[in-house]
């Protein structure tokens, strides 16, 4: 008797490319999120992206609340939640690198609010996936949370991010090749559930990025495009695993 079931949650909209940052309010409207946004960011992403997003909402007559965090901690998550309880937003928009995205994702999940991911760097596949990494002391916790309802990645902003963040994103993708092998071994030796679809997608994404390695250079939007699309694919693989 077949009794297997799964519930796969994926972003509804993924908007990537040149000068798409101003499209955030339209993307929010398209996924039917209502109410004013709480924009979660950190100091540098605030200057390069979040202020512009807040202004875009203001042009539509929507007053966004903004909270600037310094690091990804459970204390930062609580601070975002406290600000949300005071502001009563309809959604959370995370604008920044992996740390900001993770904090906003966990806070949105805890509050039951829709979350929109706006990465300013292509540093890891958490910009799309349903997991967040939050450190506590010497321990880094991997926390399950709903994936973003939408992702908006401006390749101009991402291309201008520090190069080491982009290379970290590349390493995150390429490491999937060995991660899948470990997963397959655990399946054979320990009976760990293995998803052929997720494994195949992860391996394909890693192989495609390696094949295009010569096209990835600092400061190029085309390079940011390649890496971000690969991170999206990797994040989707995590969600269907």
Where do the language-model regions lie?
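A glycine/threonine-rich phosphate-anchoring loop and its flanking beta-alpha core
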Residues: 12, 110-207
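Fold-independent oxyanion-binding glycine-rich loops
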Residues: 18-19, 41-43, 95-97, 118-121, ...
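Structural signal for hydrophobic packing residues in well-ordered secondary-structure cores
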Residues: 28, 32, 57, 174-182, ...
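Short glycine-/acidic-enriched loop or helix-start segments at secondary-structure transitions
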Residues: 49-51, 103-105, 127-128, 162
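Alpha-helical scaffold segments in soluble metabolic enzymes
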Residues: 23-27, 52, 79, 106, ...
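A short, small-residue-rich loop immediately preceding and capping a beta-strand
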Residues: 84-122
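ATP/NTP phosphate-donor binding region
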Residues: 1-91
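Active-site segments that bind and position negatively charged phosphate/pyrophosphate groups
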Residues: 195-241
């Amino acid at each position: 008797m077949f009794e297997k079931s799964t519930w796969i949650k994926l972003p509804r909209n993924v908007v990537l490319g040149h000068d798409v940052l101003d499209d955030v309010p339209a993307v929010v409207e398209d996924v039917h999120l209502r109410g004013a946004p709480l924009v979660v960011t950190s100091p540098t992403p605030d200057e390069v992206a979040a202020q512009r997003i807040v202004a875009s909402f203001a042009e539509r007559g929507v007053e966004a609340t903004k909270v600037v965090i310094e690091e990804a901690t459970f204390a930062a998550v609580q601070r975002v939640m406290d600000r949300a309880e005071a502001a009563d937003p309809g959604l959370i928009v995370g604008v920044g690198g992996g740390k900001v995205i993770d904090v906003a994702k966990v806070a949105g999940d805890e509050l039951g609010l829709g979350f929109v991911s706006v990465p300013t760097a292509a540093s890891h596949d958490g910009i799309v996936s349903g997991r967040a990494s939050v450190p506590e002391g010497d321990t880094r916790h991997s926390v399950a949370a709903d994936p973003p309802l939408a992702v908006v990645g401006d390749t101009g902003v991402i291309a201008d991010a520090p190069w080491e963040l982009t290379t970290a994103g590349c390493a995150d993708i390429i490491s999937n090749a060995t991660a899948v092998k470990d997963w397959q071994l655990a399946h054979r030796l320990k009976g760990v559930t293995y998803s052929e679809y997720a494994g195949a997608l992860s391996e394909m994404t890693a192989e495609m990025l390696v094949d295009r390695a010569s096209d990835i250079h600092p400061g190029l939007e085309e390079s940011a495009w390649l890496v971000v699309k690969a991170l999206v694919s990797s994040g989707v693989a995590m969600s269907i695993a």
